[in-house]
Amino acid sequence: MHFVDEAFNEVFAGNGGHGIVAFRREKYVAFGGPAGGNGGNGGSVIFVGDKGENTLLKLKYQKHLKAPHGINGKNKGQNGANAPHLYVKVPLGTVFYTADNKFLGEILYDQQTLVIAKGGKGGKGNKALATFKNQAPSYSEKGDLGESFKIKTELKVLADIGLLGFPSVGKSSLISAISKAQPKVASYPFTTIKPHLGVVEVDGFSFVVADLPGLIENAHLGCGMGIQFLKHIERCRVLVHILSMESSNPYQDFQTLNQELKQYNPQLLLKKQIIVTNKMDLPDSLKKLTLLKQKIKGQPIIPLSLVSFDNLEILKYKMSSFLQNTPLEVNPNNNNDFKLYTLTDNLKTISVIKESDSVFVVSGNQVEIFFHRTDFNNEESVKRFNRILKKIGMEEQLQKKGAKPGDQVKICDRLFDFL
């Protein structure tokens, strides 16, 4: 299957169903009263972690994710049905952002759910709107709009250990030697163009190792596999630098690798590192290894030959030891298994802007919510909308901005006269 680790989508939560105006009309029942039911809630767009998924290929080609709308209320006080949610399966390690790169949430566990776009609330029917002062209202509420916006989705592979190095240093050969993974192995650069995962077991302790695409100088600027490669390293708890003794200067290669990590994210240098010198069967490899050990202090260096498999078990035990002594990283943005993200801000915020001498623009979630709930073809519904605006202080704010009787007030796409 083609590996895709980035997708751009637009999510549309369902609108709430409309409440209706109805009255109880039965024989021998005088003054039956209001009987209009409420609308059902719109469906939300919910992403679900699935350990069986390993690519964002489906999301790449499914640009629009739409949840169904709630059902309108019915007479005899019957409420409309809530719409089913739209569940979208994604791989573990999927991260969600808005179009302007604001973090929404991430999926780390199997069956973990993340509500990205919340469905609209169903509107109230006239039965639910009845009060002591108005026992038979002739108006109802329209359903709230569901949230809709563009998102960016990234997959950062979940692995305990990441193998990194320049192209053709032996990463794919190493992961196939220590696990049952079978990546493509060839003698030309960039054979690995997608991450490969392998499970390694040492004395009953198992962990996941990722063979990541080859890194080149200036990868943090987008060269080679660029950021598509570097972002996968962020998940790994331990990094294994694979240096080829075929190189004229393995130490310089090591410095270049760490410089690329630093330029992308300085926090990556805080991760534990193991250095592997591969191709120790080549001439002059021992001399290069001696020079390397003189320059690099305090980090384990394991000489390796994937021809004779020397020191392979030592490397596996070192990986296991490092992992068991490295605490799991906790993402501060993801404290709960269930995360609800909503684009709405403070409901009580009202903004009044003077657009011209006689036109004032009013915005704010509370105003816009009641605007969309109002049926402007129903006079009683419009009167209720005006009462609500006065109650939440809009009239007072307009007067502070200099609004006079006869001026116009713009709310969403509609103009009103200021009286």
From Swiss-Prot:
Mg(2+) binds at residues 172, 192. GTP binds at residues 165-172, 190-194, 211-214, 278-281, 305-307. GO terms for biological process: ribosome biogenesis. GO terms for cellular component: cytoplasm. Gene3D superfamilies: GTP-binding protein OBG, C-terminal domain, GTP1/OBG domain, P-loop containing nucleotide triphosphate hydrolases. It is found in: Cytoplasm. Residues 342-419 form the OCT domain. CDD domains: Obg (cd01898). Its cofactor is Mg(2+). It holds the Pfam family GTP1_OBG. Its EC number is 3.6.5.-. Its main location: cytoplasm. GO terms for molecular function: GTP binding; GTPase activity; magnesium ion binding. An essential GTPase which binds GTP, GDP and possibly (p)ppGpp with moderate affinity, with high nucleotide exchange rates and a fairly low GTP hydrolysis rate. Plays a role in control of the cell cycle, stress response, ribosome biogenesis and in those bacteria that undergo differentiation, in morphogenesis control. Monomer. HAMAP family: GTPase_Obg (MF_01454). This is GTPase Obg. It comes from Aster yellows witches'-broom phytoplasma (strain AYWB). The gene is obg.
